[in-house]
Amino acid sequence: MAPPNTIDAGLTQRHISTSAAPTSAKPAFERNYQLPEFTIKEIRECIPAHCFERSGLRGLCHVAIDLTWASLLFLAATQIDKFENPLIRYLAWPAYWIMQGIVCTGIWVLAHECGHQSFSTSKTLNNTVGWILHSMLLVPYHSWRISHSKHHKATGHMTKDQVFVPKTRSQVGLPPKENAAAAVQEEDMSVHLDEEAPIVTLFWMVIQFLFGWPAYLIMNASGQDYGRWTSHFHTYSPIFEPRNFFDIIISDLGVLAALGALIYASMQLSLLTVTKYYIVPYLFVNFWLVLITFLQHTDPKLPHYREGAWNFQRGALCTVDRSFGKFLDHMFHGIVHTHVAHHLFSQMPFYHAEEATYHLKKLLGEYYVYDPSPIVVAVWRSFRECRFVEDHGDVVFFKK
């Protein structure tokens, strides 16, 4: 069995020399990249049939477990302020925030399963459970389900993907590559970015990881450019079609109900209480969601495609599996270390994705991408080096 691809210390995307390879200073992986030629039929046939079987009972058991953990953590947090020792309180609250953020991220993932209809064979059960769970986390369920479906149908496509769409050379203010002055300006820009104070990079990372998720929902931050204001809460957003109107209304009502409950709790208890029990863990959920999805789709060695080269399976392979450690991988229901399988077959339930990944590795060989880098290293590398792609070309890679 071919070993999985690795990033940085060894990620290679089928390093095969061709006579057409340019002699520029492009990295070797970009010069020698060849398009994968797998069909979706042969990919599906390598996975055992039972991996596609869905169980509503099993899905509900996972929901019950996660909600039980969230409830127990909430009840434990009600005892924190009873400790007279301030040191215990100062340590216990962050512990609660971190753990509740992890658990609620797992709940978010289960709602995400519902949106893909991989939770059960019942569309009614899927949408009911998904709407409840996502509304609790201030996510417009159907709105995001629709845009996320479009993301899966066009992953890695420069003009059709819905999120983490790279900026182009012209969008970051660089002159055309053919311009003689472009090389000098690009080099100056690269030097500037390399010398950028780490604290500045860290600041923008914090902003993106804490507020990037609501910014995407509210104003389509990092999403596809539609040429006008776009929001998941707007019934006439260009993301949606007229037939989605009532789904958007239902989604908005779910979020409004959750916000109403939070406002009522703030009035009855206090804003500080709601902040400690809900808002801070909610920010941790935002952090995990953006971190996970950013790392899944952003790396210097992953290509993006334009219409001339894109197809579904090529786009689905433009994502990275990695591990956050056994505990987090378990709590996040495999969304991190089985993401390639998920993108190929989004209706496959998460509890079969690990077995499916085992078989996919054998078929895909070096086209299966796994990154063993420490998470901090991977984030820093992608954040600093993935700045833009070229304005032209069917296959483009990130530049810095």
Swiss-Prot record:
It catalyses: (9Z)-octadecenoyl-CoA + 2 Fe(II)-[cytochrome b5] + O2 + 2 H(+) = (9Z,12Z)-octadecadienoyl-CoA + 2 Fe(III)-[cytochrome b5] + 2 H2O; (9Z)-hexadecenoyl-CoA + 2 Fe(II)-[cytochrome b5] + O2 + 2 H(+) = (9Z,12Z)-hexadecadienoyl-CoA + 2 Fe(III)-[cytochrome b5] + 2 H2O. One of its GO terms (molecular function) is acyl-CoA (9+3)-desaturase activity. It is a multi-pass membrane protein. Its EC number is 1.14.19.6. It is an enzyme of class 1 (oxidoreductase). Keywords: Fatty acid biosynthesis, Fatty acid metabolism, Lipid biosynthesis, Lipid metabolism, Membrane, Oxidoreductase, Repeat, Transmembrane, Transmembrane helix. A motif (Histidine box-3) lies at residues 339-343. It holds the Pfam family FA_desaturase. Pathway: Lipid metabolism; polyunsaturated fatty acid biosynthesis. Catalyzes the desaturation of oleic acid (Delta(9)-18:1) to linoleic acid (Delta(9), Delta(12)-18:2). Belongs to the fatty acid desaturase type 1 family. This is Delta(12) fatty acid desaturase.
